[in-house]
Amino acid sequence: MEFKIMSTTDKIEQKVIEMVAEKLNKDKSIITTDSRFIEDLKADSLDTVELMMAIEVEYGIDIPDDEATKIKTVSDVIQYIKERQS
């Protein structure tokens, strides 16, 4: 039996992709770290606000509006979370 040990980054990535899929009603198989919320996943501004709020609750962090506007991709979210958790 083989066990895969997930790094913190892997766990964050997996959870963020699940959250994005749920909030944007997308199949998580189409979401990558390079996926852009508006251009690739067809999110609107309300979708992105709701997603940022869910991320804040899940990870116990604050994402000010001026920072949220800079978050364009799944990778941006993961990086933001990692920076706030370290």
Curated annotation (Swiss-Prot):
Signal peptide: none annotated. Residues 10-85 form the Carrier domain. The keyword Signal does not apply. Keywords: Cytoplasm, Fatty acid biosynthesis, Fatty acid metabolism, Lipid biosynthesis, Lipid metabolism, Phosphopantetheine, Phosphoprotein. It is found in: Cytoplasm. Transmembrane segments: none annotated. The modification O-(pantetheine 4'-phosphoryl)serine is found at residue 45. One of its GO terms (molecular function) is acyl binding. Belongs to the acyl carrier protein (ACP) family. This is Acyl carrier protein. It comes from Rickettsia canadensis (strain McKiel). The gene is acpP.
